[in-house]
Amino acid sequence: MASAVLVAPIVLAGCGSDDGGPPLLTWYTNPDNGGQATLAAECTESSGGAYRIQTQVLPNDADSQREQLVRRLAAGDSSVDLMSLDPPFVAEFANAGYLLPVTDPADVDELTEGVLEGPLLTAYWDDELVATPFWANTQLLWYRQSVADAAGVDPTAEGFTWAEMIDAAEAEGKRIGVQGNRYEGYMVWVNALISSAGGQIIEDAELGAEATPTVASPAGDAAAEVVGGLARSSAAPSDLTTAGEEEARSLFQSDDGSFMVNWPYVYQAAREGVEGGAVDQDVFDDIAWARYPRVDADEASRPPLGGINLAIGDFTDHPDLALDAVKCITSVENNAQYMVEAGNPAARSGAYDDPEVREAFPMADLIRESINDAGPRPITPYYGDVSTSVQRTWHPASSVQAPGTPEDTDSYMSEVLAGERLL
């Protein structure tokens, strides 16, 4: 079933302020360490009594978050004033009429000023601002300095490629940490490789089911050569077919570790591991970082893009107050605070100049650059179909061939989008 075909409506009662106090805004959040609840309290305070914000935590995984929000919004639930939304779902929700667009040019300017280019691309649908980047994310290349030195490579060099990285790991008898399980993290990897090679997974994404799959291309072949080449090399991790972010991190910190592509949280996790005795200090001191590796030495990489956008529910009873709350939550100051306290990178460029951010993230400038230059996953109401098509035709990684796999993906995806194949 196409992901743009939404769950049937259910009857839900909206929430409001029935105690005579300021209007109550409900913010549906993804799970975090409490940072969003803190921002809700602080913005409530700074509103001077104009509104109150309560948070409602969604399930852990993105698919369950989407399902719960869709059920409420399909029922016209006015209690969904604000929602933390995974960027790939923005187009689907906006296309269904679930998100309240920001139309006043002054408001658009305020919400987008200083927002990095990568996340800003995910906030629009049909030329309207339908969400505001709250925090962003990207993957860096993490490497063990001792391994790079022994192999005689410099991962910070401008033209450093996946092929060079694989050769270096093989030469030193080490393994590379990637996300090879059949899940969204694998789609993130494949999309980043295709984008880095100058291609895209679909064209005319705004056409929805009429979009054209374009994986079968020189860029798709180049991406397949990286995935299949790594999988069939001695640098592949033994658990490649089931590896996610945490498996990659565990490998990287082990004696077999060499290189890894992963989100910035791994640095803080390693530091906390040292404090807790789970990671040796010499391992932490050996960790270095660089920009996401290139597919082609002559073409800059387009690193992965993640994060959360903040959207206003179209059925809210308090659209103006919800907009004011979004402005508060996504301010530069709160972006910086959330990055330090929750460990999630900021969507606004100015937050990276904050002294506390720079202390917590020595690679802050690289994170900012990477997010700005990142390649978003396809922006389409049928994103679930597109992602699942890639995951099913590219897994396991050891089966990926060029040519072959890209053509299979286009055929499979075309049938899914046309309703000729069920997922």
Indicate residue ranges for each PLM-predicted region:
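C-terminal lobe and pocket-closing loops
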Residues: 265-283, 295-393
